[in-house]
Amino acid sequence: MKKTFFQQYILPAALLLATGLTSCKKLIEIPANPPTEIVQSQQFADSATAMTAVVLVYSYVAQQTGSGFGYNDAKLPESTGLSSDELIYTSPNIPDMTAFSGYGLTNLNSVVGQLWTSPYASLYPINAVIEGVNASNGLSAGFKKQITAEMQVARALYYFNLVNLFGGVPLSLSTDYNVTEKLARASVDSIYGQILSDLTSAQQNLSADYPSSGHIRPNQAVATALLSRVYLYRQQWQQAYDAANTVIASGSYSLPSDPNQVFLDGSTEAIWQLPATSLYYVTQEAHDFTPQFGAAPNYIINTWLLDAFEPGDIRTQDWLGQTVVNGDTLYYPYKYKNIQAGSPTIEDYMILRLAEQYLIRAEASAELGNGAAALADINVVRARAGLPASTANPASQTAVLNAIMHERQVELFTEWGHRWYDLKRTGMAAAVLTAEKTGWNANAALYPIPILQLQDDVNLKQNPGY
């Protein structure tokens, strides 16, 4: 019998999670004796077998995950941190990483290839679950809505990153190879249209309660929080404000007073987290950013980011590590601190957190003409960092927006590509990166389509400049 996608790739991952990774909490309950073979026609016959398929998808996603949700090997925080003004790469181990800093990317770059293929590898099983549960005659309408909504949130997040890295990309919503084999690039507007469709549908069908322990499987707030980000990027200011306000006003989340508590399992700030599943280290970020055995860090904080922190900002103590190499003090990202698996302190990958919602509501308020409300929101984030209230003039929209961008820079650094995306969406990239770095040109705002994808799909067209 020919193995299904789940049998061949996802089930072994789930079994590994269930039996071998005792240091990681379970994503959702895995049956005591999970099946070793799932026939395609039986995968969604009832809620038990359907949940097995869902477990497999989450297991697969978690095994790939860096803070970029399925971008572990692709190094999303690292590559976008180098493309922006956050990081400097010091190691000779991955030559293709250096190209991100000097805007020398080509369609042969292996990291760019992973940035493309990693999300599409996860989109296939996500689409398979959506199709499977909705085609089943053995599942209740409520169950179908719940699982479909969870998968829609995951799909929306993948496409959000794809469209911000590459621009228009193939929009694959099916598992039918005849449909997906030669897809052309959908427009940016079409991609965002699908993202909004998925998230608004999910928001309507998810409960306020999380469907499992922890903040792993999405609830309604997860869909709403991601919607607020998407609305912000689309300059739909009132919708962005309303969505962020809904999450903040719910009272379900709070900012820990200690920044060191933010990225821990069960953080009160966490809207959506996934557990790390590596056998050898806790999170990809801790592994990549934290120096070991007295060596220099592979990635150090760029001077421009270091200088952006104000005196007295405790984030420099809690979220920046430092080491002395050859007499030079080097700083590195230290939001995730645990290097070795089995650490007594569990850190989870943070996907969505409350501080971003405050900053989204602040920016939306500023764009809507309410500078005082905007400053009140960024001051909440500043207070946690041990800083006084912003001195920006609330009557000056430019001053308020600059204050918000500054706060996003020092609060969200090396998370999710926020800085890279912010520079591009606000039109600041040329001015900031031309002043700070060499080699910048407008074409560098989008990464090249990988050569293998162009060879496999004749309908794909390369981005300008590559």
What is the meaning of each model-derived region?
Residues M51, S59, P92-L165, Q204-S207, ...:
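Conserved, well-structured interaction surfaces
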Residues S23-C24, T283-E285, Y299, E310, ...:
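Long, intrinsically disordered, low-complexity segments
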Residues Q40, G68-S91, A208-A286, S390-T398:
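Short, surface-exposed recognition loops and adjoining beta-strand edges that mediate ligand/DNA contacts
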Residues T98, Y241-L354, E411, A444-N459, ...:
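Hydrophobic-face positions in mid-chain alpha helices that act as interaction patches
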Residues C24-L76, A244, S390, A431-Y466:
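Membrane-proximal, proline-rich intrinsically disordered regions
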